[in-house]
Amino acid sequence: MARRPGSSSRGPARSDRLPAEAVTSARKPHAAAPTPPASPDPGLVLLGEFGRPHGLHGEVRLKSHTSEPLAIAGYGPLHASDGRTLELANVRPAAGSSPDLLIVRVKGVDDRTGAEALNRVTLAIARERLGKVEDEDEFFLTDLIGLTVEDGAGTVIGTIVAVPNFGGGDLLEIRPAAGGPTALLPFTKAFVPSLDIAGGKVVADPPDDLFAPPGPKPADDPG
């Protein structure tokens, strides 16, 4: 779950189905821990991503996006990005690693070959299985995908197509209304002063060169 930039913390939303509060909330600016990326499918919420195999007997590394990393095992069957439905078993922390990195076994995967096939596969849960968000300042990052981006004058400048996070905070990937390559805008109060999910838009204050093409390389640049 995410929180509007600059809003105060009010505690987790309650759930009448699966525990929505287990999904990591968006962090305030400058927080150390990254947040989960939004799913490209608005009907799904990402919960984790597999990494490299661990050993020879089917175990595999998994980066959990839930606020309590081990809680990912309690969601039952999950949607995998390769089209399968997978269920986790024997989940434990990865020794000597960050708290969100786990060693897991997937039901039906019993050897290293099967574990290798999971590398970079993501796990998601159907949004409808999560509880309702009752706090007006909370939402899923998936809710942002498809919203129109306007500037302060009400001019449409683009559409949000993804919400990546590379470790430094959530970013809005915006496809410009005029066409051309997408650009990334930090999802902070300074750059996104207003958010109206119900109205289908955000108001942004981007730098003037947000969609500018890369400039020419300096003459002495060896690249």
Swiss-Prot record:
Low complexity bias locations: 1-12
Domain annotation PRC barrel: ranges: 136-210
Matches recorded under InterPro entries: PRC_barrel-like_sf, PRC_RimM, RimM, RimM_N, RimM_N_sf, Transl_B-barrel_sf
Main location, first listed in the record: cytoplasm
Domain of life: Bacteria
Any one GO molecular-function label of the UniProt entry: ribosome binding
Record localization: Cytoplasm
Keyword Chaperone attached: yes
GO biological process: ribosomal small subunit biogenesis; rRNA processing
Signal sequence region: none
Residues covered by region (Disordered): 1-44, 204-223
Example of a GO cellular component annotation carried by this entry: ribosome
Keywords: Chaperone, Cytoplasm, Ribosome biogenesis, rRNA processing
Subunit structure: Binds ribosomal protein uS19.
Family as reported in the entry's similarity comment: Belongs to the RimM family.
Task of the protein: An accessory protein needed during the final step in the assembly of 30S ribosomal subunit, possibly for assembly of the head region. Essential for efficient processing of 16S rRNA. May be needed both before and after RbfA during the maturation of 16S rRNA. It has affinity for free ribosomal 30S subunits but not for 70S ribosomes.
Domain notes: The PRC barrel domain binds ribosomal protein uS19.
Protein name: Ribosome maturation factor RimM
Lineage: Bacteria, Pseudomonadati, Pseudomonadota, Alphaproteobacteria, Hyphomicrobiales
Gene from which the chain derives: rimM
